[in-house]
């Protein structure tokens, strides 16, 4: 009845991780809203907005709406702050495992 927690691999090669996320985000627009970032990361909308408010994730405020350029999202996804989060989303863990096996 107990679940075994397997820790995801830590992102060692930032350049490879950056190329991985660039390939994953290639189909998305260059500037996206919070909903697209939520869909991609698997984190709650409030969490993503909190990252923006405290300055961890850079975003543009446009008509009372946050817009996130793809390059800012990739910077955040490759950051130590993001990858050292204690409570990772399932999608975050899956992407870390996939990035480890990924070849460009």
Question: Predicted segment positions?
Answer:
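N-terminal flexible/basic segments that precede or flank functional cores
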Residues: 1-17
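Major-groove DNA-recognition helix of helix-turn-helix-type DNA-binding domains
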Residues: 40-67
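Polyanion-binding surface elements
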Residues: 17-47
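A short, Lys/Arg-enriched interface patch at domain edges and termini
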Residues: 2-5, 73-104
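Acidic, Ser/Pro/Thr-rich low-complexity regulatory regions
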Residues: 10, 24, 28-29, 34, ...
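Short helix-start
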Residues: 33-35, 58-82
